[in-house]
Amino acid sequence: MGIVGNSEVRVDAFDKATGRTKYYEDLVPADALYVRIKHSTIAHGFVKSIDLSEAEKIKGVVKILTCFDVPDIPFPTAGHPWSMDPGHQDIADRYLLNRHVRYYGDDVCAVIAENEVAAMQAVRAIKVEYEELPFVLDAQEAMKDGAPQLHER
């Protein structure tokens, strides 16, 4: 008839109960590196300088990339980024790492480490100096003449 009221034998029950089932964490190669991102702590501005000295001392840190290390190659993030029709292409307004911070949480550095703990500790140890710029939090205010502009026209 149906499943309701009847015991159902799960095909994966034995493997799960005996520990043979492979989960995501079981599939990570032993030599895999971990990446964590340092996010901006301001809503709008420019990264003036980045102090990596303490972060680079952390055992297990392999490399730290900053917004000054990667090229400014813009890419779109949504919609039709690869459309051949210019009318359907989204604005290429994102960068891998950002010198011009446009929102709280924008990506400014990437830490590559041998383990997740080292990566997270290094992110916390990075010190970023910003030149803060004005911003608005209201859509109506953002449309007014003279409102702060996040993107170049």
Residue ranges and their predicted role:
Residues 1-153:
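Flexible, low-hydrophobicity surface segments
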